[in-house]
Amino acid sequence: MGLKADNWIKKMALEHNMIEPFCEANIGKGIVSYGLSSYGYDIRVGREFKIFTNVNSTVVDPKNFVEENVVDFVGDVCIVPANSFALARTVEYFKMPNDVLAICLGKSTYARCGIIVNVTPFEPGFEGHITIEISNTTPLPAKIYANEGIAQVLFLQGDEPCDVTYADKKGKYQAQTGITLPRILK
């Protein structure tokens, strides 16, 4: 399994729509950087957020998620409360090849401010916007800037295509648009 370089990422984005919209340059002056890098792609966070709240004093249960646990917010800057959590989505829409797995890591600019980003792997055959989990681990409110970088995606190509892709198994987050809350298949 090999890590893919910028020339491969660019080719797959431009010729196979793997990343849309795609930014060939790494943009970073005066903002949190995004776009193509040497061995990855820095994704942007969109303008839509779901911020966790304890107003209703419920319990967060991934098997029975209550939408009242989050407050919807749209804007250019999202303030994540101290010791809290938000969901967001990427600006980019991904179409993963059947022999490629992507791993996403938070950007150091945010990590150095106590903001931790988690994204599960993009499985072979997955298509959709990526839901991003953002944790503010600090005792202070934290700013997240929409349409700027939030994490870096690394692409790993397998030695051969897998037998069953995410699309084949009809993954529960396949073709998601916007922010997708937890789902359990029943």
Swiss-Prot record:
HAMAP family associated with the record: dCTP_deaminase
Superkingdom of origin organism: Bacteria
Entry EC no(s): 3.5.4.13
Taxonomic lineage: Bacteria, Pseudomonadati, Campylobacterota, Epsilonproteobacteria, Campylobacterales
Pathway in which the depicted protein is active: Pyrimidine metabolism; dUMP biosynthesis; dUMP from dCTP (dUTP route): step 1/2
Pfam families, per the entry: DCD
Function description: Catalyzes the deamination of dCTP to dUTP.
InterPro entries (UniProt xref): dCTP_deaminase, dUTPase-like_sf, dUTPase_trimeric
Residues that bind dCTP: K107, S108, T109, Y110, A111, R112, Q152, Y166, Q176
Reactions it catalyzes: dCTP + H2O + H(+) = dUTP + NH4(+)
SUPFAM superfamilies for this protein: dUTPase-like
Keywords: Hydrolase, Nucleotide metabolism, Nucleotide-binding
Record GO biological process: dUMP biosynthetic process; dUTP biosynthetic process; nucleobase-containing small molecule interconversion
NCBIfam families membership: dCTP_deam
Quaternary structure (record): Homotrimer.
Family to which the UniProt record says this protein belongs: Belongs to the dCTP deaminase family.
Active site: E133 (proton donor/acceptor)
Molecular function terms, GO-annotated: dCTP deaminase activity; nucleotide binding
Protein name according to UniProt: dCTP deaminase
